[in-house]
């Protein structure tokens, strides 16, 4: 999101680096011809979730939101099987990623294309017990 209270010398809004990176990732995914994405929303993957939502509003990608990561991953696997196209699954950090594991194994053994995008906590919070 744009931080409206801070501006560069040019008067243009300063964009958070995570937001900028998320927009680049989404643009590359859309340009690769990927048509669907499945998101399990969380605080750490908010920039990706927002960028995918913005692409969805513009009609560039079909957004599917599933709160439960296991459900999300298997739902994406079904889309990949039906379409033959890669399907990104997006989640936050920590144990959320582990919940994708069964579907990722299934995708690997059946040669179905899943693209796993996960967010991580800031470096300053790694190995501190912050969850």
Feature-to-residue mapping (PLM):
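N-terminal alpha/beta PP-like core and its mobile active-site loop of ThDP/TPP-dependent enzymes
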Residues: 2-131
